[in-house]
Amino acid sequence: MKRVNKKVVGVLVLLVSIGSFYMWKQVQKHGKTSQQETKQKYIDAKTEKPTIHLFDDNKFVFVAQKDGLGGIAFGQDYISVLDVHQKQINESMIDREKNGSPKIAKDEYFNIISYDLNASGFPSKKTEVYQLLGKKEYRGAYDISLYYADNKDYIPVTLYKVGNNESRKIIVDITNQKIEDLENFEGYGKSTFSAAEQEMSKGNVYNNIRQAMKEKYHLKFTAGYIDTLLSKEDREKIDISNTNFAQDYPEMAKDIKDLARLYMRPKQYSTKEWFDTVLHWFAPKGQNVLEVYATDQKTGEKTQIKSYDELQAWSANHPE
């Protein structure tokens, strides 16, 4: 009888031990799951330093970025990119009663990295927007563009509060690393090249150049810059090997499929020089100009335009 009782007790002890071990594993597993669920997630936006070429008396800038697209702001004195590390905010983190999103944590940052076009090697400098802002509940939008005014480069930034959709627009003076309200810039939002585009549009020449650049080279021409079409397929088709540009600037031509932008710096910009230069660059190797035509809207007559001055003369003889 005692031997039977000992066996029963032994079995019970074993069962209790197994049960305890199972419960311990479940608690441990649950704890890990909770930690994983509560672990803070972050959204990062970082654009590596692009390839930069400054050429032709430092008037023109060629910027290439490996793997194509990315946030870059193209200026007179700086090429700027974002370096951002921000919390991913979910509903549980928002205090609706206090009408706001969580405060900016110490490990969050919203920085603008700017590469100096006027210094050898294009060294970088960091503008820490959160430090300049002093506000601890606004987060920045993941977007970058450039506004040029008063001979300075500015980066507009949209700030927002997650909890109540409140937003604020500021503008960052990259040269002096200061913040100003966007309201102080009356000309903001107006196209810098609208007048140049109108000049080139006489006789539909502007659209003629755009069409030629797209069909021949899969590049997008505008009154102020050249970049690539958005689709990856178009990038793969880019081939400028038989152009004057490739002959004159072989190092840049090698990076053409990674082109982010080719532009004339704002302070040095003139419609005449941009127009004439592009016609020469993208002419077939050995030829003077890309073949483009002005069209008389009344008669349909086409006239080849070989320079900005020729376009002006044609326009004077064909008033609309």
Describe each model-derived feature in a short phrase.
Residues Q35-A64, E97-K136, S167-S194, N207-K272, ...:
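Surface-exposed loop/turn elements that mediate protein-protein interactions on large endomembrane-trafficking
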Residues M1-V13, W24:
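N-terminal Sec-pathway targeting helices
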Residues F21-Q36:
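Sec-dependent signal peptide cleavage junction
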Residues Q65-I72, K135-Y147, G187-E199:
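Repeated scaffold domains used in trafficking and secretory/extracellular systems
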Residues H85-N90, D95-E97, Y160-N165:
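Short glycine/acidic-enriched loop and turn motifs that connect beta-strands
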Residues V81-D83, V157:
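Residue position within the beta-strands of beta-propeller blades
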Residues H53-F55, F60-G75, I144-N151, N317:
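Structural signature of eukaryotic scaffold interfaces centered on beta-propeller domains
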